[in-house]
Amino acid sequence: MASTSAATPLKNKRKFENGKKKPKTLKDEFGEKLDIKPVIVPPKPADEYDYDSSDEEDLRNTIGNIPIKWYDDEDHIGYDKFGEKIAKPAKKGEIETFLEKMEDPDYWRKVFDKQTGTDVKLTDEQIEKIHNIATGKYPTIGYNPYEPFLDIFSSQKEIHPIDNRPEPKSRFIPSKDEMRMVSRMVHAIKMGWAKGPRAKKEEHKSYDLWASEDALDNVTKSQLSRMRVHMPAPKVALPTHAESYNPPEEYIFDDEERKKWEEAEKEDRVLNFMPSKYDALRKVPQYDKFITERFERCLDLYLAPRQRKMRIHADPTDLLPDLPNPNDLRPFPTTLAFYMRGHTGQVRAITVEPERGELLASGGEDGTVRIWMIATGRCIKTFQMDGEVTSVSFSPVADRTLLAVAYEGKYVAILNTGCGDRLHVQQTEALLAETPTDAQEDGAVVTWRKSKEKLMLKMPNEVRQVTWHSKGDYFASVAIDDIAKSVYVHQLSKAKSQCPFQKRKGHVQAVTFHPTQARLFVATKIHVREYDLARCVLVKKLITGCKHISTMATDANGENLFLGGLDRRFCWMDLQMGNKPWKKLKHHTAAVRSVAYHKKYPLLATVSDDGTAMVYYARIYTDFVKDNELYPVKRLRAHEKTPNDLCMLHTTWHPTQPWLITAGADGTIALFTY
């Protein structure tokens, strides 16, 4: 038992006697009291290394609450409590910052203190406050804005009442005190002592003579509701010269007018009175129809219904579309670079080499075809034709130096320009030599024959236009005359020609091939028809809205047609949207002679006989969500009018640069650059 009691720890029991707490007593293992006195332990001295700070790092900046940027140009950031300057700490380089970011685990919780120029490490409490502010919570840590609510009154409906005491008898017996009070009041009324409430004196309301009629200070709700739906009566017409007491002579009726006025019905009279003339105002008698007219006006105001007309007050400038800044739509041609002179007479057609755009071919009224260097503007070669040139077109194949020329005398010539890469020139010579012009059928309408460096096609009629297919083997020609067989399609590799149309559908003005498909667009005076050459069927008939089409062009994908007319109109046909124009513009004052769309840039140009070339920013979107964009950006002038009112006859774009080239009736070719 002794060992057991020795193993038991000392117990300290609390005993209370008479509500007082006894002091603690400790006993040993034999039950004897131990006398233990409290010992005062001195506090442990603070370790100087627990607070890791030096005198230099513990400086306090005493500049106060002023912008720290005032010290940007100084070599210090302020002053300490002794008035000494606090030097700026050395700035860390990018390498030191990167190493500290990688090696210091507490880098993310350090912020830069502008007052001391050092990084301060945030505590956990500060970080938690910042997190609460960033997440939209209360900055105070542990704050709960939604404390539990203690509902004092129970929401449960009880059957039994809380207090079930019976009602006292006094509740059912009339009160004697109230009876005595009522009897006193009755006696006072009988004796005349009790007096009722005094009547309030009505205040005198003075009428404000100068108040506005529209004032709403003392208006009732019913009056206000009537005022909202009130329609003011039309005002009486102002008097005219005929109602004057001394009107001019032309207002006085003669005998014929007087008789006509008297015989006319009252409703048919222009004036409901007969003008009179007096020498002085004092001689004017009383108006005999005054009461009648006022009565009729009262009837009109009372019986005639009124109608409220809503007028839209809109600023005309708000109805105009918002146009972008032309500087944001660059590049586009703005400046005349130089002229190319050499033709005598009109320059009717021009075309540019399709690959690099180094060469330009032009055909004129003087019967010459000239090859120009675009970079220098010099003529490097000239071909003399037997008639006036009406159309020229470079072959779209890059490795061929072929040029199709239509000129008067019912001829179409395929020339080898002999300019450019020597290998391409030799390949073109071999191609022309291999063309089977001898294997022609007897009685052919179009005859092919070779003549030195060119192929000659004898046409049945004068040719207006010649154009190539994108693959370079087929080209089409259009006759000037209004006949059924005005369009011919020629195949260069087989030296054959055929007329795809046997019936006359209208006077054909221009044709062009689809860039990617075997289709042909044929433009008459007012319509454009799209034919499928593979199936020989009509695909679509377009209603252009032009009275007389003069030119036609397509974009690189063949999904849009651009038309110009002699009626000064320019039409943009979006083939995916329907058979009607998407845009119709009339920016020219004379006939539109040519339209061209750039292959690389969203640029469109039209030239006219008014001596101007309109440059448009024409953005075509393949996405059906976005609509096409068309903005006029520049109007160019370079040519002079001739006596027959002709000016700009043709235009084309450089294939790789935003340069515009125009041909004029004054015998010059103009190049516009940006």
UniProtKB/Swiss-Prot annotation:
GO CC, any one term: PeBoW complex
GO molecular function, one term: ribonucleoprotein complex binding
GO biological process, one term: maturation of LSU-rRNA from tricistronic rRNA transcript (SSU-rRNA, 5.8S rRNA, LSU-rRNA)
Keywords from the named record: Nucleus, Repeat, Ribosome biogenesis, rRNA processing, WD repeat
Compartments, record wording: Nucleus, Nucleolus; Nucleus, Nucleoplasm
PROSITE patterns: WD_REPEATS_2 (PS50082), WD_REPEATS_REGION (PS50294)
Disordered: annotated span: 1-28
UniProt signal peptide: none
Compositionally biased intervals (Basic and acidic residues): 15-28
InterPro entries, A to Z: BOP1/Erb1, BOP1_N_dom, WD40/YVTN_repeat-like_dom_sf, WD40_repeat_dom_sf, WD40_rpt
Annotated family: Belongs to the WD repeat BOP1/ERB1 family.
Name of the molecule in the record: Ribosome biogenesis protein BOP1 homolog
Organism: Caenorhabditis elegans
